[in-house]
């Protein structure tokens, strides 16, 4: 029975030794390159996901093309829908062009009318520039526009009084400004 016990006890010792060796090897490998292994696994997972999505899309496209070849009615319906959409878009564009042309026509008519009014007012001797807020008076009881002398700026109050200019030192005040001298600030021989 001693012989029967020896192989049994020797075998677990070999297994524990190999497990210990495996544990030490894997532990040192993870300690040295653990983050690299983790990031490469995550990157590999992301790449596999992206490729699987693209493969699914490619398969779906191939199936759609195969169905389109098998069903010509679907192709005809798609082409008709596309033509109808193009026609609607063209009609919308044509309507926008017509609106724009009408607006341009109205603007040209307004400009032409203003030029005619300006020409007429110049022929009558009036100023052709009208104030938009006040219409001009026609032959009013007051004096004619050619004999009235404009008042100028006498009605307006000056923004600054007294003619004081701080840059020149003119006009009231006890302090006057003079520009500084050029050259070094301290006196010395050069």
Curated annotation (Swiss-Prot):
Protein's membrane topology: Single-pass membrane protein
Keyword Transmembrane: yes
Record keyword DNA repair present: no
Predominant location category: endoplasmic reticulum
Keywords: Cytoplasm, Endoplasmic reticulum, Membrane, Selenocysteine, Transmembrane, Transmembrane helix, Ubl conjugation
Ranges for region Disordered: 96-190
Residue span of region VCP/p97-interacting motif (VIM): 78-90
Residues annotated as transmembrane: 28-48
Post-translational modification: Truncated SELENOS proteins produced by failed UGA/Sec decoding are ubiquitinated by the CRL2(KLHDC2) and CRL2(KLHDC3) complexes, which recognizes the glycine (Gly) at the C-terminus of truncated SELENOS proteins. Truncated SELENOS proteins produced by failed UGA/Sec decoding are also ubiquitinated by the CRL5(KLHDC1) complex.
Residue ranges, compositional bias (Gly residues): 160-174
Annotated compartments: Endoplasmic reticulum membrane; Cytoplasm
Segments of skewed composition (Basic and acidic residues): 97-118
Gene3D superfamilies noted in UniProt: 6.10.250.2950
Disulphide bridges: none
GO process annotations (BP): cell redox homeostasis; cellular response to lipopolysaccharide; cellular response to oxidative stress; endoplasmic reticulum unfolded protein response; ER overload response; ERAD pathway; negative regulation of acute inflammatory response to antigenic stimulus; negative regulation of endoplasmic reticulum stress-induced intrinsic apoptotic signaling pathway
GO MF assignments: antioxidant activity; ATPase binding; enzyme binding; ubiquitin-specific protease binding
Record-level GO cellular component terms: cytoplasmic microtubule; Derlin-1 retrotranslocation complex; Derlin-1-VIMP complex; endoplasmic reticulum membrane; low-density lipoprotein particle; very-low-density lipoprotein particle
Family: Belongs to the selenoprotein S family.
Summary of subunit composition and partner proteins: Interacts with DERL1 and (via VIM motif) with VCP, suggesting that it forms a membrane complex with DERL1 that serves as a receptor for VCP. Also interacts with DERL2, DERL3 and SELENOK. The SELENOK-SELENOS complex interacts with VCP. Interacts with CCDC47.
Described function: Involved in the degradation process of misfolded endoplasmic reticulum (ER) luminal proteins. Participates in the transfer of misfolded proteins from the ER to the cytosol, where they are destroyed by the proteasome in a ubiquitin-dependent manner. Probably acts by serving as a linker between DERL1, which mediates the retrotranslocation of misfolded proteins into the cytosol, and the ATPase complex VCP, which mediates the translocation and ubiquitination.
Stated name of the protein: Selenoprotein S
Organism (species): Rattus norvegicus (Rat)
């Amino acid at each position: 029975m001693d012989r029967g016990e020896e192989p049994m006890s020797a075998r677990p010792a070999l297994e524990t030794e190999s497990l210990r060796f495996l544990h030490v090897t894997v532990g040192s490998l993870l300690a040295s390159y653990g983050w690299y292994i983790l990031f490469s696994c995550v990157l590999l997972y992301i790449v596999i996901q992206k490729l699987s999505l693209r493969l699914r899309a490619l398969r779906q496209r191939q199936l759609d093309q195969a169905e389109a070849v098998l069903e010509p009615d679907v192709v005809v319906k798609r082409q008709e829908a596309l033509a109808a959409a193009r026609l609607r878009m063209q009609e919308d564009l044509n309507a926008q062009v017509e609106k724009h042309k009408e607006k341009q026509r109205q603007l040209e008519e307004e400009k032409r009318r203003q030029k005619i009014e300006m020409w007429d007012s110049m022929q009558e001797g009036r100023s052709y520039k009208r104030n938009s807020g006040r219409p001009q008076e026609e032959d009013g009881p007051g004096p004619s526009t050619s004999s009235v002398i404009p008042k100028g700026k006498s009605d307006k109050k000056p923004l600054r009084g007294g003619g004081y200019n701080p840059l020149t030192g003119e006009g009231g005040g006890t302090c006057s400004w003079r520009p500084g001298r050029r050259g070094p600030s301290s006196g010395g021989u050069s």
